[in-house]
Structures are given as structure tokens and as C-alpha cells.
Amino acid sequence: MNRPVTRKDLMIVNIGPHHPSMHGVLRLIVTLDGGDVVDCEPILGYLHRGMEKIAENRAIIQYLPYVTRWDYLATMFTEAITVNGPEQLGNIQVPKRASYIRVIMLELSRIASHLLWLGPFMADIGAQTPFFYIFREREFVYDLFEAATGMRMMHNFFRIGGIAADLPYGWIDKCLDFCDYFLTEVVEYQKLITRNPIFLERVEGVGILGGEEAINWGLSGPMLRASGIQWDLRKVDRYECYDEFEWEIQWQKQGDSLARYLVRLSEMTESIKIIQQALEGLPGGPYENLERRGFDRKMNSEMNSEMNSEWNNFDYRFISKKPSPTFELSKQELYVRVEAPKGELGIFLIGDQSGFPWRWKIRPPGFINLQILPELVKRMKLADIMTILGSIDIIMGEVDR
């Protein structure tokens, strides 16, 4: 009887671009030696739509609906970066009330993004039950978005100089109720997931990334903070009004997939702290209060002029002044950035004294973070690829643009 010949040559496997664990249309060409990964080549570009070139042929107000299609799970951040650039170029001041509402929306969007990362990440490594609990909480966030903006996703809420509309009746109370509820659910996640021995076996020590290596690769966000680097643009740049709130940078030093999970879980708790402080300190309070005071002001026109002027203050508005659709970008260049859920989202903007930007360069965090994938999966097992890729947290709309 002849024995079968054992083949010792390498095997090449195509994963994607429609594999459910790819989180979009990503293709991986993986070279295997048995079950060990020798090499991995990501193939990008399946979702490229020419977002940068479109920006150069649109006014900013026309381009705003497009930007929500980059990272379509954290659209508030793409809107924020789109209006921040023209605001800085035109020296446009944003009312404090609008800035507070922006922070609330950004942090809710961060929570929604992290939740939508956590559910599929757990499903990737074989845990189906948390997926349904996590999507239940995500629905509450989307209900808040729908009440405030009219849209569950693709909100189109930010405007140059402020926001599109003030918060509706009862929204603040509803949001505070959600914050109290969600903090208890995060504790449940920790009991259900963090101490699970099967989960720890899949993520602990998998995809280890050192701090110096993370800096050299230009990584940002939870990928960087999970490697021991305390870097958060909300603390560094102090954009909007983040410097007025008390919160801490969440970081870990192990640099593995577990550390990246812990950073994101802790960030959701910190986001709730920021939202609660912003809701309690919102200039003018709920919209109902502002409207009632405005009505009282009209009814009592003979009241003290100082009291009248107090509630007509610039800081109580939701937008400074609506710019013209032909708003011109001054002839200078500027780089603006925000701390998105996946890392540093930036735009390099060049104006040329016209309504259209001369150059609109997008720096997507997912695209930069994905470059480290081949290094992280080498010498790992084939099954670990999904764990490592999931821990990076990519959205292909943002990667390919």
C-alpha cells in the first residue's frame, strides 16, 4: 500500500471580499504553512468612490451629505471634521450651546460605533449571545439620534457655525435616562464577556503590538492607546469644549486584542460621563426653558433690559449665522483633526478664494490602522486572523473613500 505523499509547499488562501468577518468588501490573500500564517496581503479599493475629488467640485454645504458615507457607523465625526475646517479658515465662532450639543452627539456616536464594533467582534470569535444584547443598546442610541436629527444614520446634523436644529422637547431627559441605564449594561458586558475563559483564550496575547511600533506605523485611537500610549486628541487639541469636562484617557499597556477590547469598553463609560456633564451644563438648559423664557420676554417687554439681553445671548443659540451657499474658502491651507472612534480623522484643506476647496485630503484612521495587519498576523494561526482584524475595527467605506 502506497503512503500518500506529504506536501510541504505553502498554500495560498483567498479570504473575502464577501466573507462575513471582513466587515466590508476587503480581500486578504493569506499564505499558509499548515495552519500557521506566513504572509497576508490586504487588497483594498472595492468601495472607492472618489470622495476627495467629489469634494473639490462641491460647496461645503453640498458636500456634507457625502461625508456621512465614509464611516457610516460614526457619521457625526465626519460631519464635524467637514465643518471645522471652513470654520477655522473663516474665523467663524460657534455658540457655546451648539458646541455642547456637538459634544453630546459626538460621544453618542462614539458609543454607537463601539457597540457596533463589539457585537460583530464577539460573533467573529464565536460568541453569539452578546451580539443581541449589544444591538438592543445601540437601538436606544439611534432612537436619540432620530429624535434630534430625523435620521437614524447619515444624520446631516452639523452646519458651519453650529448645528441644523436645536434639541427637541424632552430630549435631554430621555438622554439622561439612557445614560443611567447604559452604565448598568456596561457592567453586564464585563460580567458576560471580560471574565469569560473562552473569550480570554481567543484574545489574550493575540496580535501583540508595542507602543514604539504603533507610533512608527502612525496608528491612532484605541490601537495606539492599547499599546501604552496615552494620546487622545480631545485632551491634546481641546477642540469644541472638551477641556470643560472631567474625564480620563483610557489606555492599556499589553497591546493585544484583549487590551484593545478593554480600551473601547472603558471609553464608552467615559463618553457617558462627558454626556452627563454636557447635558447638565448645557447653556440655556433644555429647549423648553429657552422657549418659555423667550415667550416671557415678549409678554413682559417692559422688564429690565439686562434680563432681556441675558436670554438673547450669543451662547444660547444653536447656530451663529447661516453662511451663504457660496461661502468662499480663504486662500490658505489647514489641517484639522478629531478623535474619531477608530482614531485620528483628519482633513488637509487648501482654499483658493472660491466656493470649492482646491484640495481636500482625507486622513482616515481605518486606512492607516489596517496597514499593520500583515505584521500582526504573521506566525499566528489562521483562526486568529479574524480576531486580530476585528480588534482593529475597520469600516471599508472610510478605508477606500
Swiss-Prot record:
What GO MF terms are annotated?
NAD binding; oxidoreductase activity, acting on NAD(P)H, quinone or similar compound as acceptor; quinone binding
Entry keywords, A to Z: Chloroplast, Membrane, NAD, NADP, Plastid, Plastoquinone, Quinone, Thylakoid, Translocase, Transport
Picking any one GO biological process from the record gives:
photosynthesis, light reaction
- What kind of membrane protein is this, topologically? Peripheral membrane protein
Q: What EC number(s) does the entry state? A: 7.1.1.-
* UniProt cross-references to Pfam families, sorted A to Z: Complex1_49kDa
Q: Looking at the keywords, is Membrane present?
A: yes
| Superkingdom of this protein's organism | Eukaryota
Question: What InterPro entries does its record include?
Answer: NADH_Q_OxRdtase_suD, NADH_UbQ_OxRdtase_49kDa_CS, NDH1_su_D/H, NiFe-Hase_large
Tell me the Gene3D superfamilies matching this sequence: Cytochrome-c3 Hydrogenase, chain B (1.10.645.10)
| Predominant place of localization | plastid
Catalytic activity from the UniProt record:
a plastoquinone + NADH + (n+1) H(+)(in) = a plastoquinol + NAD(+) + n H(+)(out); a plastoquinone + NADPH + (n+1) H(+)(in) = a plastoquinol + NADP(+) + n H(+)(out)
Cellular component (GO) terms are: chloroplast thylakoid membrane
Record's family? Belongs to the complex I 49 kDa subunit family.
Function noted in UniProt: NDH shuttles electrons from NAD(P)H:plastoquinone, via FMN and iron-sulfur (Fe-S) centers, to quinones in the photosynthetic chain and possibly in a chloroplast respiratory chain. The immediate electron acceptor for the enzyme in this species is believed to be plastoquinone. Couples the redox reaction to proton translocation, and thus conserves the redox energy in a proton gradient.
Q: Describe the subunit structure.
A: NDH is composed of at least 16 different subunits, 5 of which are encoded in the nucleus.
Name the record gives this protein:
NAD(P)H-quinone oxidoreductase subunit H, chloroplastic
Q: Which organism is it from?
A: Aethionema cordifolium
What is the organism lineage in this UniProt record? Answer: Eukaryota, Viridiplantae, Streptophyta, Embryophyta, Tracheophyta
